[in-house]
Amino acid sequence: MLTKRIIPCLDVTDGRVKKGVNFVNLVDVGDPVAIARRYQEQGADELVFLDITATNQGRQATVDMVAAVSRQVFMPLTVGGGIRSVEDMRALLLAGADKVSLNSSAVADPDLISAGARLFGNQCFVTAIDVKTDPATGQKMVYTHGGTKPTGLEALAWAKQVVSLGSGELLVTSMDKDGTQDGYDTAFYKELTAAVDVPVIASGGAGKIDDFADVFLNSGVTGALAASVFHFQQLTIAQVKEDLIKKGVPVRWNQTLQRGS
């Protein structure tokens, strides 16, 4: 089994980290730079920075904020939100992002995936996919614009398409699970990871320490993203990693990791 990654996520709007349930009812969590520094100290493997209102407001993720965060952390930083061109990608990479993430713009212009992968390499290109269950059919469907717009795209088919276009990684969020803290949609991630040959990050639903081992041991995901459980300090990253090691899940470990907040 490959080494698994624990990845906190900063959902940022108006320069502040926010968190809600099912993509709504956002509450203020704090300053992005301070929170990023805390996760650096706790031993996060990567950090995801998503400007969650950039697309709806017709703007790019704040480059200055990305630069400020990148100066504080020494782990891979993935940035998404409002990216519409290769110039936007270049600006974020120059500001300190290690990877860029497309979501709504990838659906609007799939060729943007190929263009970004050709210019910057598929290793630094992530496609984020927000997935919600259709109550009528039970199918997993793709939504964009912060989960507000249905696309009519079936999730597995879209995942296969973006990989074929050059995406080097998938960040897949279960909208049904987002912020609920009742566990990842492990069955879906098992199906998804069997269908694609790139790393997949699971997102949405982490609430208790067992949830991380469950998704790693019962699906092929290589990373588990979480927000609420870390932001509100119900668990630390070090506590999660200690539990994973006990359960036979390989993770990066450093004896100096902070167990507290």
Swiss-Prot record:
**Location(s), subcellular:** Cytoplasm
Q: Name one GO biological process term.
A: L-histidine biosynthetic process
Known EC number: 4.3.2.10
Task: Note the NCBIfam families from the entry.
Answer: hisF
Gene Ontology molecular-function annotations = imidazoleglycerol-phosphate synthase activity; lyase activity
Q: SUPFAM superfamilies under this entry?
A: Ribulose-phoshate binding barrel
Reactions accelerated catalytically: 5-[(5-phospho-1-deoxy-D-ribulos-1-ylimino)methylamino]-1-(5-phospho-beta-D-ribosyl)imidazole-4-carboxamide + L-glutamine = D-erythro-1-(imidazol-4-yl)glycerol 3-phosphate + 5-amino-1-(5-phospho-beta-D-ribosyl)imidazole-4-carboxamide + L-glutamate + H(+)
- One Pfam family named in its UniProt record: His_biosynth
Q: What does this protein do?
A: IGPS catalyzes the conversion of PRFAR and glutamine to IGP, AICAR and glutamate. The HisF subunit catalyzes the cyclization activity that produces IGP and AICAR from PRFAR using the ammonia provided by the HisH subunit.
Q: Which gene encodes it?
A: hisF
Identify the keywords attached in UniProt to this record, alphabetized: Amino-acid biosynthesis, Cytoplasm, Histidine biosynthesis, Lyase
Which cellular component terms (GO) are annotated to the entry? cytoplasm
Q: How does the record describe its quaternary structure? A: Heterodimer of HisH and HisF.
Identify the catalytic residues. 11, 130
Q: Which domain of life is it from?
A: Bacteria
Q: What is this protein called?
A: Imidazole glycerol phosphate synthase subunit HisF
Organism expressing this protein natively: Limosilactobacillus fermentum (strain NBRC 3956 / LMG 18251)
Quote the Gene3D superfamilies the UniProt record gives.
Aldolase class I (3.20.20.70)
Q: Which HAMAP family match?
A: HisF
Pathway linked to the protein: Amino-acid biosynthesis; L-histidine biosynthesis; L-histidine from 5-phospho-alpha-D-ribose 1-diphosphate: step 5/9
Q: What family does the Swiss-Prot or TrEMBL record give for this protein?
A: Belongs to the HisA/HisF family.
Reply yes or no: does the keyword Manganese apply. no
